[in-house]
Amino acid sequence: MKTDKLLFLAAAAACAGTACGKTPEKPNIIYLMFDDLGYGDLGCYGQEKIETPNIDALASQGILFTDMYSAAPLSAPSRCCIMTGQHMGHSQIRANYERLVPPESLGWNAIFLDDTLEGQQPMLADTPTLAKMMQEAGYKTAMVGKWGLGYPGSESTPGKMGIDYFYGFNCQSLAHAYYPTHLWENDTKIATGNETIMQGEPLPEGLDPMDIASYERYTGKFYSSDLMYDKLENFVVENAGRPFMAMWTTTVPHSAVQAPLDEVMHYVEKLGDEKPCTDGGMYLPNRYPLATYAAMVTHIDTQVGRLVAKLKELGIWENTIFIVTSDNGPACNGNSPMEFFQSGGPFRCRQGWGKSSLHEGGIRMPFIVTWGSRLTPSKTAHVAQFTDLMPTFADLAGVKAPQNDGVSFAPILLGKPEKQQEHEFLYWEYPSAKGWLAVRVGPWKGLVKRVIKGNGKMELYNLEDDPREDKDVAAEHPDIVKRMWEIIEANHEPSPLPVEKFQMNLPQPELPAEE
């Protein structure tokens, strides 16, 4: 009897963990990453003007991260860090870099007339990636949206980096167009039916800048966000019976700001009339740039609602992890809608403090995770970075991750926050925009600007008391500054790619005097 009882208990334990012999079901993963969306651009993060009801609903059902960071403040390096799990001191792609730079006489927009120029610097052919890891775990993988990590035909196209199905923009420069002449489906260039629309030019003289009809020349027949959403939904439907990972790397709301006119007019009625952008400063002239920006974000939010409904219809919603985030902070150029919408949320976000900077406005990201009804709705102040995605997905998929700089946050998703490991530190470097370095340790953030100019003076902020980074307290805490520099020196390595733009030498540290 005692032996029978022990056997029964052992069998019951096995059933509890594996559904009586069946392998535990691996969750599907949908990773929606906006492009240049600010921390404060979603309703669930405090936005009051842009409507995002479907994403807000996800936040109310899942976990909202308050301290999630991009690993880089710009598109290509951010995406490289996600794919490799490496922080910017170890990663390959450390800046945006076109593989073929057009002659200055042609101008930056020459790529819209000569698509043989398209594409960016590729990663190395043997690079371990998050997508390859998920393939090894038995997942079907897709990316719909923007790639930007290797030109067509290179050793670093989506298909060669672990993506089973790709549809969208190979080239991030061409991704600035919402009515493109072509998109890529795997390695095949697909004509969209749109005519070429040149960017970076002002509204022609003689046209009335206050007349919406003057801007019709900048609209095509087929809106890229709709073309890509349809492919995403098709992928989900076709793979509903097996584990899948879909990376939805939308180009919204990156300039040029464009959206369907009826959706723009909704916000014109809501926000009122506004000054048009006529100089091409947002890549294209636009009669209602603020209303259009808002309409773009809401357009994707509506698609989120459609996709959630489809997942429920297919019966796979309860086993689908749905993540919403952004690649980096909002653009802060002279025509940016960022100030009007307070896109930086609680963080200072102005010229030099958003995208392309390592201030909080450039790297602190909205980050929402839902998993059917499995998660207890909550907020977490766990400090995390995009490098954590690789080990987290590995834990969820039951596979060993390649070497990476991340810390899995799977315990938070699995309802075991007491087992969550914390980062000893987060590290950033960025060799563009005069060069930046940053480290976060607990509430402390060290920041070095103008690194390429040889500046070695670190600013220090206590983010708990000063999230806007207003008060530099480095002089009061020389011991913390010294520790930050030790972390920098231990984590900086040259990029393995022979691209000068990716390299940055460390300056001589200027340490504050100890009392």
Which residues fall in each region the model found?
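Bacterial Sec-dependent signal peptides at the C-terminal "C-region" and cleavage site
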Residues: 14-25
